[in-house]
């Protein structure tokens, strides 16, 4: 029997009694955000809204984005990345479990020197894929052109964020490249690996 989202007590400053809020709202109040699912428009908009709101509330205090994601849609992932670069506070990224595809792109988008992976985390990079393989020829060509532009954008961001040469990142994105936390650190996707 599902119990829903757990609730925890929270007392606002100046209030005598605590109120019960769902655990995610409590964590958001501490500036802790979660990408724990496939990247899509809904989770992207939710994270963007939270980052913007929290940066307006306090533009000096860091945000923490915990990532355990198999990847997902490219455009919503790029929107999360762009928002991370736009907001005033630093966004620290933490990989726990898996950051694959768009998940690794968002992970790399954290403030350089503030990107962390748990010791047993896995990171995977690859090129963006299309689901329009049943489209008419004309549509398919347009889709392929757009996909090439997106691939170039993603590759250039990885080059900028990791310090790796363009040829290496481009070659690695040709296939699924899985990395341990230490390998992701050596590659430049994360800066630190948490100690066990």
Curated annotation (Swiss-Prot):
GO terms for cellular component: chloroplast stroma; endopeptidase Clp complex. Component of the chloroplastic Clp protease core complex. Pfam families: CLP_protease. The gene is clpP. This is ATP-dependent Clp protease proteolytic subunit. Gene3D superfamilies: 2-enoyl-CoA Hydratase, Chain A, domain 1. SUPFAM superfamilies: ClpP/crotonase. It catalyses: Hydrolysis of proteins to small peptides in the presence of ATP and magnesium. alpha-casein is the usual test substrate. In the absence of ATP, only oligopeptides shorter than five residues are hydrolyzed (such as succinyl-Leu-Tyr-|-NHMec, and Leu-Tyr-Leu-|-Tyr-Trp, in which cleavage of the -Tyr-|-Leu- and -Tyr-|-Trp bonds also occurs). The keyword Chloroplast applies. Cleaves peptides in various proteins in a process that requires ATP hydrolysis. Has a chymotrypsin-like activity. Plays a major role in the degradation of misfolded proteins. Its main location: plastid.
């Amino acid at each position: 029997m599902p119990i829903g989202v757990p609730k925890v007590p929270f007392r606002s400053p100046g209030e005598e009694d605590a109120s019960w809020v769902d655990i995610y709202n409590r964590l958001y109040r501490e500036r802790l955000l979660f990408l724990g699912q496939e990247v899509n428009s809904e989770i992207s908009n939710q994270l963007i809204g939270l980052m913007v709101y929290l940066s307006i509330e306090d533009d000096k205090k860091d945000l923490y984005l915990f990532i355990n994601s198999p990847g997902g849609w490219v455009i919503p992932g790029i929107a999360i990345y762009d928002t991370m670069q736009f907001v005033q506070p630093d966004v620290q990224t933490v990989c726990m479990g898996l950051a694959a595809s768009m998940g690794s792109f968002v992970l790399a988008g954290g403030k350089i020197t503030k990107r962390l992976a748990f010791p047993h985390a896995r990171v995977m990079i690859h090129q963006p894929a299309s689901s329009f393989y049943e489209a008419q020829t004309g549509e398919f060509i347009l889709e392929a052109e757009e996909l090439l532009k997106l691939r170039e954008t993603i590759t250039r961001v990885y080059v900028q964020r990791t310090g790796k040469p363009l040829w290496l990142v481009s070659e690695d994105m040709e296939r699924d490249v899985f990395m341990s936390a230490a390998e992701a650190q050596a590659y430049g996707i994360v800066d630190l690996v948490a100690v066990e």
